[in-house]
């Protein structure tokens, strides 16, 4: 499945991650380096499988762990109303 960021999301990139602000809810969220990479790929309209494949190439991680981490972060971004299905 593909997701897209909501238009009302502001992003500030930090040295070790990013901070996201949902202008609708007025809440902010912090992401670590992996979460930030996932956010970047969502903005490029990558699907969940592509995101997992990219993490497997870029990080030393086993596939089950990468899949679980991607799903967890996507679920958190959905719950925070920062992304929606594309």
Residue ranges and their predicted role:
Residues 27-86:
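Long, charge-rich, low-complexity alpha-helical segments
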């Amino acid at each position: 499945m593909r997701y897209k960021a909501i238009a009302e999301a502001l992003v500030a990139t930090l040295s070790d991650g990013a901070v996201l602000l949902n202008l609708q809810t007025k809440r902010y969220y912090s992401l670590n380096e992996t979460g930030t990479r996932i956010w970047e790929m969502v903005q490029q309209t990558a699907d969940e499988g592509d995101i997992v494949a990219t993490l497997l190439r870029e990080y030393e991680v086993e596939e089950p762990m990468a899949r679980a981490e991607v799903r967890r972060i996507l679920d958190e971004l959905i719950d925070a109303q920062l992304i929606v299905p594309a």
